[in-house]
Amino acid sequence: DWFYKDGGASLFWPEKWKEFVETIPKNEQSNIIKAYHKRLFHKSKEIREKFSIFWLKWENSLASMQKSINNYTPPINYALAFSRIENHYFFNKGFLGSDDYILSNAKKIDKIPGIIIQGRYDMVCPPNSANKLKNVWPKSELKIIDFSGHAMSEPEISRELIKATEKFKN
């Protein structure tokens, strides 16, 4: 709801949200994931490609604090693969039973240690989501990374991911 409905991330990037939704008919804008699914899996290659770029531009606009990433237009093959895979999962609610499935089932991993790495300025997955997970996963450690967004390419996020991997490699 935060990322694909008006009133969440769209409040921070209204001009990018407008670009993302304006090509979708008004009567379909209440369910952007479904509307994009229809177009990303359309029989017309031209329509699939056009909407895969729109999808990725919205994602990239909010994924990083680095301007170079925000203005990047990827190769069409990447845009198609990324947007279709991501949309397919979202369209199918991540193949989970409910929106709160992970939080409701955290007890299944409560004895397993883990590190949650979260950008302070993540506009894709807001920090309160990571905090909610930390609150139900006692063996987890939450690292909020200041001056970072969502993307793995953010320098501090990358560093923390490597440190976390090193910690658990043995």
Please place each PLM-identified region on the residue numbering.
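Active-site nucleophile elbow and catalytic-triad environment of alpha/beta-hydrolase enzymes
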Residues: 88-106
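Catalytic active-site module of serine/aspartate enzymes centered on a nucleophile-bearing elbow/loop
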Residues: 140-170
